[in-house]
Amino acid sequence: DIGHGKGSFSFKVAKLMLENNFQPDVISSDVHKLCINGPAFDQLTTLSKFLVLGVPFYDVIEQSTVNAAKALNRPELGTFKVGSVGDVSLLRIDTGSYDYIDVLGETLAGDRKIELDGVVLNGQWWHTA
């Protein structure tokens, strides 16, 4: 579990991990008042960092949803199966010039960023970003 917050997650370690074919089981964030303004910011920024590091979008989403639900022993989450919780985040990948920062202050330039378009909770449209 990545658990990106104020004290864990460096690009150097993440790159070494990925270069050695060691994918994270779970990509999560540990956002709190000391890191909400950086370096973690939010879950989508954490996911974007892995996208820019070369992890395919499908894997990034699976590691943040399906695998996270399994790690929490919550099989009703992280799936679209009939009878499961009807929660969905509608995401898009924006392209441009983005700078990402890790807990050591190192930066990574990227050309993609995952953004939120809307949210469905319990099968009901809840929010448009």
Give, region by region, the residue ranges found by the protein language model.
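Structural detector of well-ordered beta-strand residues that form the stable sheet scaffold
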Residues: 1-3, 27-28
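His/Asp/Glu-enriched, well-ordered alpha-helical/loop segment
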Residues: 12-93
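Active-site glycine- and acidic-residue-rich loops that bind
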Residues: 2-11, 71
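Short linear motifs at secondary-structure transitions and domain/linker junctions
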Residues: 2-4, 63-67, 92-97, 102
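C-terminal cap of metal-dependent C-N hydrolases
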Residues: 86-129
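Basic, gly/Ser/Thr/Pro-rich low-complexity segments located predominantly at protein N termini
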Residues: 8, 35-37, 123, 128
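Hydrophobic alpha-helical scaffolding
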Residues: 3-7, 36, 54, 109
